[in-house]
A protein has these predicted regions:
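Active-site catalytic loop in hydrolytic enzyme cores
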Residues: 109-172
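Active-site beta-strand/loop signature of hydrolases that rely on acidic residues for catalysis
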Residues: 7, 30-63, 68, 72, ...
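A short acidic, glycine-rich active-site loop
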Residues: 67-88
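Catalytic metal-binding/acid-base residues of hydrolase active sites
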Residues: 13, 51, 106-107
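Active-site-proximal beta-strand elements of phosphoester/diester hydrolases
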Residues: 3-22, 129, 142-145, 170-172
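A short, hydrophobic beta-strand-centered structural micro-motif
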Residues: 83-111
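Short catalytic/ligand-binding loop motif for oxyanion handling, primarily in non-cytosolic enzymes
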Residues: 17, 53-56, 109-113
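Transmembrane beta-barrel domains of bacterial outer-membrane proteins
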Residues: 22, 28-29
Length: 172
């Protein structure tokens, strides 16, 4: 394994307009990864924690408290949609820039894909999940945050599982 030759720590301010549509989010992610263009491989880019959280709040129109009263399942539907957009955009970006991508995190139940069932979640609990992609855009790991800060105590803690991932540059 050769070490990563290009490392990019993305610094980004979260502004609602970057999260209102899938297209706006895609443009933002690609703009933030632009410094990777023309750099030597293997590349690793890391987004800040909770980079994906505003998708839950702003995607397809803001989350109105009144809507929550009318529809208690709304957070789960919104999380599923936000997770889908986050996953697709980040996978596409990993492929486009040929980079391993640690895609910040979002609050969501952890989803899995199966051919027969499509996308489903084994647990209804929200976790602070970081997604890790390879340069082909494949999701290698969903890593739940281990140590929760006090406001996050209502989230389900991540159990420590097989979160070491083999890359061209060794284990991450």
């Amino acid at each position: 394994a050769m070490p990563f030759r290009t490392l990019l720590a993305v610094q980004a301010e979260a502004r609602p307009e970057h999260y209102r549509t899938a297209e706006a989010f895609r443009e933002r992610v690609f703009a933030l990864l632009e410094p990777l263009s023309g750099t030597p491989a293997p590349r690793l880019a890391a987004f800040p924690e909770l980079f994906g959280l505003p998708l839950l709040l702003h995607l397809d129109g803001g989350l109105a408290p009144k809507a929550l009263l009318l529809d208690p399942l709304l957070p789960w539907r919104r999380a599923r949609r936000a997770y889908g957009v986050f996953l697709e955009v980040m996978a596409e970006a990993a492929r486009a820039f040929g980079a391993y991508l640690l895609a910040g995190s979002l609050l969501s139940p952890p989803y899995e894909e199966e051919l027969a069932r499509g996308r489903f979640s084994r647990t209804p609990f929200f976790q602070n999940l970081a997604l890790f992609f390879n340069p082909k855009g494949r999701l290698l790991a969903q890593v739940p945050k281990m140590e929760l800060t006090p406001p996050e105590r209502w989230l389900r803690r991540g159990r420590f599982g097989p979160h070491l991932v083999e890359t061209e540059a060794g284990k991450v």
